[in-house]
Amino acid sequence: MRIKKIFITTTFDCNLRCKYCFEHNKTNLYIDVNKMQAILQKEFCDSGSYDLFSITFHGGEPFLAFEEIKKICEWTWKNYSNYNILFAATTNGTITNENIKTWLRQHKKHFNIILSIDGKKEYHNLNRGKSFDMIDFDFFLSTYSRPWVKMTVTPNTVEHMYENFIYLQQLGFNTNPTLACEIDWNEKTDLYKIKKELYKLVQYYISNPTERPGDLLSLPIEKLITNKDIYTTRCSLGSGYVAFDVLGNQYPCQNFIADFSKPYSAESINECVNLINQNDYRKITEICINCVIKEVCSPCYGLNYSNRASMGSVDKVWCYITKVLVYFNAYLIIKALTNGKQYIWLKDKSQIEIATLATAAKEIINLKNQLL
């Protein structure tokens, strides 16, 4: 399926001030509906034969601009009913009043929600203010079938990652634990805690074959084999991705918009796009050339650019974290392929793909001393 992914920043404003948020210098700018409708019209006309348009609203907190979202969605459904279009929003879930709830219920087949909840109340509130009790859990769980939750893990909650994951799973959410980016991880003490929690997550997925692993444990480790001596860019940016800020400025993806105070530079963004289109990671992240997992790793060019002014300026601690993640991905594959259970996330793979995964996993396990 060919998917066009469009990311729209509805506002630079947010009602929360999460400690780990990498979107800096929030302002009360909001999206212009007419301008965004014109942008979407062009995207639909120019995008060719895509099977699906996936349009995701970001913020800030996107539902601060609910009326704008509503107008854009209803205009799109009216004028492009012959297109397969799915909307979504990533939200903290704290401002969904009855008006928003009614609208979401009416359009739940065409408008998905990704909630930001970090686990139990005591751990969620550590980084997200006293916002836990502001979320209507019953509404989201009754409206959507196992709604997705992005559970952000930070140094002050990492040793409770598995505990918080299980808590949200048992509530009925589909939980995706992620490690916070662009914050101060300690490469010794925090890495040790990450390893312990990842081991528990692996055991969970091994014991629950109908559950699909989240982002931390679904890295494409087969690329260690399939991308050997291939130097394509390690990010999936390309013609299938585009992002727009509240002013309608275009970016390769939403992570290029992390600093809301930074003035837009079309020249700088065009340079990034041209470099990405050359499709050779060596021209972007030279530091990766001799890395043993370079085929698997996907450094975030957007966060590098928005936080350190260069797509090739990587967060060194994140390199250590990624090596740990790759190892535990391989460990999960080895366990899954040797215990005789049928895993939902493996059943659609061919025998050749399974064999490639197994080979890659074994090679990675043999690199244990370099990764851990």
Regions found by a protein language model. Name each.
Residues 17, 21-24, 256, 294, ...:
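Cys/His-rich metal-chelating microdomains
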Residues 196-226, 250, 254-299, 335:
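C-terminal accessory region of radical SAM enzymes
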Residues 290-372:
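Radical SAM enzyme core and accessory elements
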Residues 6, 37-56, 65-186:
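Radical SAM/AdoMet-radical enzyme domain recognition
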Residues 2-34:
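Canonical Radical SAM [4Fe-4S] cluster-binding loop centered on the CxxxCxxC motif
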Residues 161-167, 172-228:
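Long, K/E/R/D-enriched contiguous segments that form extended
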Residues 7-10, 14, 284-287, 293, ...:
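Short metal-coordination and nucleic-acid-contact micro-motifs, chiefly zinc-binding Cys/His arrays
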Residues 235-238:
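Short, small/polar residue-rich loop motifs at catalytic or cofactor-binding pockets
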